[in-house]
Swiss-Prot record:
Belongs to the bacterial ring-hydroxylating dioxygenase ferredoxin reductase family. It catalyses: 2 reduced [2Fe-2S]-[ferredoxin] + NAD(+) + H(+) = 2 oxidized [2Fe-2S]-[ferredoxin] + NADH. PANTHER family: APOPTOSIS-INDUCING FACTOR 1, RIESKE DOMAIN-CONTAINING PROTEIN-RELATED. This is Biphenyl dioxygenase system ferredoxin--NAD(+) reductase component. Pfam families: Pyr_redox_2 (PF07992), Reductase_C (PF14759). Pathway: Xenobiotic degradation; biphenyl degradation. GO terms for biological process: catabolic process. Gene3D superfamilies: 3.30.390.30, FAD/NAD(P)-binding domain. It comes from Paraburkholderia xenovorans (strain LB400). Its EC number is 1.18.1.3. GO terms for cellular component: cytoplasm. The lineage of its organism: Bacteria, Pseudomonadati, Pseudomonadota, Betaproteobacteria, Burkholderiales.
Length: 408
């Protein structure tokens, strides 16, 4: 009998799981525990509309009235000290312990910081929560120089927003291209060109070695000696799963809490979802996917599994972004093996879809200003029908017709 489900982490994954549990008819107690003071909100806006000042606060994931109507016990500002797995109890820094029958870890991740000289200077920011976005927005003034260390999604989104605020922007990317991990080299190069067209300066193969300044950051010094002046710095080099509770309790972890395709951890009554969890991928391997859409899917899967309901097949990374005025959607790993097939022509203003084809199956897709085509491409990835490069390239054909082909 499952009388009580506790969820540690009241963000996107935690709140989505609570909603999914109620939607599936669970009538027992749900405790949603968060150490932040805010109810779950849409973090994808922090680098865009909130940072731009177009929204004072991000939209809520769920209406605040829902929690009360669904009889979900929300405890914000509550910090967990440890897990007592043997007795199925959560210990807090203060107050009585909380017993559970099933536990979901949805503690998310924190911004990775740089352990280099000058890292404690004023004016150096990270972007992970609302307070971070508000602090960065206050720091950015027209005419100032912002240096972004890291050319991933958040860095490129902030660069786009900062240029709209008339801020001078330089991106320092340690690798040879922007956005390779999520978009691949080809799309990364295209995004770099679009950012440069906006006035963003991009320095590749630029490894930040130290920050320079007296109390306030004034420059970033690269490993090769390049000096980049800065009034404000954003360190955007990824995130670290907040898996300390799980590790301390003896739950298996490796760059996140290790889970199976149902979200179950090495402890039978404990599940994990969202950025803290390393999930198995369809193409093999296991990692934290760190996307809004995957966090939602993982939370729904874990909720089903806690109630012994069927769960879907292993996941495929799915995300979206807005960079330099373009909407980019992606599914799968763009840099995997196979052939990259391009559908559309950027020079003529057509929507563009890049599809990674392997052994006659679409394994990944990236769509640029092509929302309708991406919807079909997502189904091609999911159904694994047999297609050819010529069929995918033919813009005169309807991608939807390819769904009728036989699975490979």
């Amino acid at each position: 009998m499952i009388d009580t489900i506790a969820i540690i982490g009241a963000g996107l994954a935690g709140s989505t799981a609570a909603r999914a549990l109620r939607a599936q008819g669970y009538e027992g107690r749900i405790h949603l525990l968060g150490d932040e003071s805010h109810q779950a909100y849409d973090r994808t806006t922090l680098s865009k509309t909130v940072l731009a000042g177009e929204q004072p606060e991000p939209p809520a994931i769920l209406d605040s009235a829902w929690y009360a109507s669904a009889h979900v016990d929300v405890q914000l500002g509550r910090r967990v000290s440890c897990l007592d797995l043997a007795n199925r109890q959560i210990q807090f820094e203060s107050g009585a312990p909380l017993a559970y029958d099933r536990l979901l870890l949805a503690t998310g991740a924190r911004a990775r910081r740089m352990a280099i000289r000058g890292g404690d200077l004023a004016g150096i920011h990270t972007l992970r929560d609302l307070a971070d976005s508000q602090a960065l927005r206050q720091a950015l003034q027209p005419g100032q120089s912002l240096v972004i260390v890291g050319g991933g999604l958040i860095g490129c989104e902030v660069a786009t927003t900062a240029r709209k605020l008339s801020v001078h922007v330089t991106i320092l990317e340690a690798g040879d291209e922007l956005l390779v991990r999520v978009l691949g080299h080809r799309t990364g190069a295209w995004c770099r060109a679009e950012l440069e067209r906006m006035g963003v300066r991009v320095e590749r193969n630029a490894q930040a070695a130290r920050f320079e300044g007296q109390g306030q950051v004034r420059a970033v010094i690269c490993a090769d000696g390049r000096r980049v002046p800065a009034d404000v710095v954003l360190v955007s080099i990824g995130a670290e799963p907040a898996d300390e509770l799980a590790r301390a309790a003896g739950i298996a972890c490796a760059r996140g809490v290790l889970v199976d395709a149902t979200g179950a951890t090495s402890c039978p009554e404990v599940f994990a979802a969202g950025d803290v969890a390393a999930w198995p991928l369809r193409q093999g391997g296991q990692r934290s996917l760190e996307t809004y859409l995957n966090s939602q899917m993982e939370a729904e899967i874990a909720a089903s599994a806690m109630l012994s309901q069927p769960v879907p097949a292993p996941q495929v990374p799915t995300s979206w972004t807005e960079i330099a005025g373009h909407r980019i959607q992606m599914i799968g790993d763009a840099e995997g093996p196979g052939e990259i097939v391009v559908r559309g022509d950027a020079q003529s203003g057509q929507p563009i879809v890049l599809l990674r084809l392997l052994d006659g199956c679409v394994e990944a897709a990236t769509a640029i200003n092509a929302t309708r085509e991406f919807s079909v491409a997502t189904r091609l990835v999911g159904t694994r029908v047999s297609v050819s490069a010529e069929q995918l390239q033919d813009v005169g054909s309807n991608l939807r017709d390819l769904l009728k082909a036989k699975p490979n």
